[in-house]
Amino acid sequence: MTPRSWLFVPGASRRMMDKATTSGADALILDLEDAVAPDAKAEARRTVAAFLDTGPAIPCFVRVNGLGTGLTEADVGAVRGRVAGFVLPKCEGPRDLDRLSAWSGNAPVLAIATETVRGVRALFAEDWSHPCLL
C-alpha cells in the first residue's frame, strides 16, 4: 500500500510516537530535525531508536537533520535497517541523496519539499532521478 497520509511526530516524545500509531495515519515521520531542540538531539535519537525497536505496525520514516549540521550520519546510524525510509531536509540535489544512501544502505528517501534556493535551482538544472527516491 502506498501511504496517503503521513503524520509528523516529534522524535523527542515517546508518548507522542506511541499515540501516533493509533492516529489512523498510513505512515509516521519521526522528526529529529525541527521538532527537536539542539541540546536534545542525541536523546531524541535514542528515543526514536527505542520506539522502532518495539516494531510499530505502521511504516515509520525518520526525518534526519540536514547534511550541513554534522548530525545526519549519527541520525541515520541510530535507526538504519529499522525504518521504511528517510526524509532529508534541505536536499539540494542528487549528490546529497548519494551521501544519505551511502550511510543508509540505499534506504528509500521521501522527497517532500525543496527548502533552499539552491535546491529549487537544481530542480531545473540537474537530473534528480535517483534509485532511492520514492
State where each predicted segment sits.
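Conserved alpha/beta-domain cores
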Residues: T2-L134
